[in-house]
């Protein structure tokens, strides 16, 4: 992909809605070949840059509550996992494809944005430019 030519190293992991205890590298194998999120946190050093890409649109319970996940029972709230990522890595960004003018219509977007403390940008040329500046701070 074009992204692989722009980054020295690029590892891609998937999750559904909110980050929980497992991620996967291929969506078709999401139930059979999962990677513990703790392993990802231990594998990559704090100097790595982390970019989330997603609409952040979900039930607020998925972020705030244990057991709020829609596909499995999560023992810890998604916010706990987001906090772990934000504490481990200094340079974290969330790129959101939902037009920024619509973010206020979805409470979960606001919750994720609060966790990311201003490090959520829209998937626009201007947003990507701002996101890259944020990652380099």
Model-derived segments and spans:
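Acidic, low-complexity intrinsically disordered regions
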Residues: 1-137
